[in-house]
Amino acid sequence: MATLSSYLLSSPPLCKSRFSATSLVSGIDFISFSPRTTLSSSSTVLPAILSLSVKHNRRRNSLQVKSVASPTETISEFDEMVSGTKRKYYMLGGKGGVGKTSCAASLAVRFANNGHPTLVVSTDPAHSLSDSFAQDLTGGMLVPVEGPEAPLFALEINPEKAREEFRSASQMNGGTGVKDFMDGMGLGMLVEQLGELKLGELLDTPPPGLDEAIAISKVIQFLESPEYNMFTRIVFDTAPTGHTLRLLSLPDFLDASIGKILKLRQKITSATSAIKSVFGKEEKGPDAADKLEKLRERMVKVRELFRDTESTEFVIVTIPTVMAVSESSRLSASLKKESVPVKRLIVNQLLPPSSSDCKFCSIKRKDQMRALDMIREDSELSALTLMEAPLVDMEIRGVPALRFLGDIIWK
């Protein structure tokens, strides 16, 4: 059986990218999408006006793909994912520590090597994407990745930036929170009296999952601009399971939140009018309710993207343990409830069969086989296409290692 170490030793030196660029700057606020060009002397950036067509120069094969739903069947699994030039989004998610980032990065490399200009984005606070590519991807900037045959860019988003945006959406004219929100209406003295509405908690504390949702919505805004329509494959390395599920419920949460503010408005409308008439005080700029409504609209757009069966697919990543499989089953059920399309399940870190007398290896593999049996018998997971990824002898870092992993998973 081939190992990563032998693959890397036999691989030719990493070739330089087949593209160059001079200007890639986005006007999106909160995240500066200007490219980083100081990584190395050979790193270059893609021009905004460059138009690329996808070239499918690979040899088409009819591949054997394992499915837990039925015996081995003949289909072209990766050909389905790589075909066409219409933009597609792939969200990879699952329990923390199962290898989501490595799988996402390997898919991005695979797409690029098959001619697709690709962007891989991490919204995971752990910032593991930098480790996977062995490049510094932090700072909210698009970074070109060298090696693939088509342009590949990577981006890590700082969730704290998203939290700051939520706080700014709930503040009046540069204020610091709910007190300024009320002061801006001339009603600061009513804050304590209206404490049962918990408005301060609402406006000053971002709800769980909002940071990732805002980050994804910003990337969508960025990709909708004409100068970036070259990307035909977008791969998201999402945060652990809980964040993803909370993200999908955010529009409903914000509906309730805005409802609280509107309820507050109704209670104090007459008092506001009286104070304005006496002191001549005028509202300046949009209020918190208006800002949060715009934010809610963006969250709805993110949820709609997750549910778009034509352009989006969520890929669950797990490992062969009882706990991980159980969480993956719950994730699959929750995604189905939210109408998110899920077709594939990656089981990562599988031990290969061994002819040695390693007792630990034998016991561990039997334990993993029991976990695979759980998947085959699970009502949620058994319908998904099973994709197996082995436990390799070296850490997956850098494009050559990601190419090795991608050739195994994404057949």
Swiss-Prot record:
Entry annotation: catalytic residues: D124
Keyword Transferase set for record: no
Principal location listed in the UniProt entry: plastid
Record localization: Plastid, Chloroplast stroma
A single GO cellular-component term on record: chloroplast stroma
Residues binding ATP: K95, G96, G97, V98, G99, K100, T101, S102, N348
GO molecular function, one term: ATP binding
Organism superkingdom: Eukaryota
UniProt keyword terms in alphabetical order: ATP-binding, Chloroplast, Hydrolase, Nucleotide-binding, Plastid, Transit peptide
Catalytic activity: ATP + H2O = ADP + phosphate + H(+)
Phenotype seen when the gene is deleted: No visible phenotype under normal growth conditions.
InterPro entries: Anion-transp_ATPase-like_dom, ATPase_ArsA/GET3, P-loop_NTPase
Any Pfam family the entry gives: ArsA_ATPase
EC number: 3.6.-.-
Location of the transit peptide in the chain: 1-67
Family, similarity comment: Belongs to the arsA ATPase family.
NCBIfam families: GET3_arsA_TRC40
Protein's UniProt name: ATPase GET3B
